[in-house]
Amino acid sequence: MARGPGPLGRPRPDTVAMPKRGKRLKFRAHDACSGRVTVADYANSDPAVVRSGRVKKAVANAVQQEVKSLCGLEASQVPTEEALSGAGEPCDIIDSSDEMEAQEESIHERTVSRKKKSKRHKEELDGAGEEYPMDIWLLLASYIRPEDIVNFSLICKNAWTVTCTAAFWTRLYRRHYTLDASLPLRLRPESMEKLRCLRACVIRSLYHMYEPFAARISKNPAIPESTPSTLKNSKCLLFWCRKIVGNRQEPMWEFNFKFKKQSPRLKSKCTGGLQPPVQYEDVHTNPDQDCCLLQVTTLNFIFIPIVMGMIFTLFTINVSTDMRHHRVRLVFQDSPVHGGRKPRSEQGVQVILDPVHSVRLFDWWHPQYPFSLRALLLPIPWGQPRV
């Protein structure tokens, strides 16, 4: 049953909309006077009405100006507390504001004190420790194993500087040299008197004399278990081939590619770094730094196009069609491939070697890496084998 509009047919009076609880009260400066200051303007008022729990600055300033005008005083002549006390008005209006300002100042002082303390602690840490002379580090370096040189150089700058000296590398060579060591002529003691390329020569000699280093290179198989990925985006510096006559009735052919690997600094986009002292630049000189040699031996001669100066972008090793040998595929392009993109074979030069007998990769310190530049620059006509 529908209900009527009200008793005796009279319409109901409109209900008055009540303000929502918890909503902030809007303040107007012209409404602030001694007669319009409400309980909601004080700190102990209902927090549901005034969420801040403190008197608004606008209200306090308006009341302050009104009190001063009633007393006939200028704002710049009499302090606020005196004007309020002279007018007989309570000064509790600004008490909460003063308390908040004092609290903010206290927080700021604690923050500044904490920063000073942390800065002082950091300075103490930076100044902690003792700096030993270079002779101490040079003496300790005489007991360092070759495989621990990197860790030793990371102790401090003085330890790193010691590893840059000619005395360090000369003592390391003498410590591991033996009379029965099988060394090439360029790595003999009489050839170690020159400072130029001393570090590189000592490292090469350790792979002949030092057993842990020699054991590393003796385990390399004829065909690597996985395709080497360190040659990606390397630049081909040289290429040559030679005929190998062995126990087989038919000779084999050895194709050599010398690559210059991309510098680790370029990979990490880091142009700076520690450089050896100027007086030891000759000791650290190494023309073959970041270079390696890819050596592929095939059962017959294969024509190879000119790839010198190009970027090596793809290297795959698969099973040959006869299922008895391997097949090597090399792709060279004019520019490197970045961002994990796959190179397109139709855009570059493709080299296919099949059938392949062995694939070996030699770093610059490997005993089988060609050291003499004369051996690398043998005149070989392109497309014709040299017998």
Curated annotation (Swiss-Prot):
Keyword annotations: Membrane, Transmembrane, Transmembrane helix
Membrane found in the keyword field: yes
Membrane topology: Single-pass membrane protein
Region (Disordered): 1-20, 99-126
GO biological process, one term: regulation of protein stability
Top-level taxon: Eukaryota
InterPro entries: F-box-like_dom_sf (IPR036047), TMEM183 (IPR026509)
Gene Ontology CC: membrane; SCF ubiquitin ligase complex
Entry's localization field: Membrane
Transmembrane segments: 299-319
Coiled-coil regions listed in the entry: none
Family, as annotated: Belongs to the TMEM183 family.
Protein name in the entry: Transmembrane protein 183
Source organism of the structure: Pongo abelii (Sumatran orangutan)
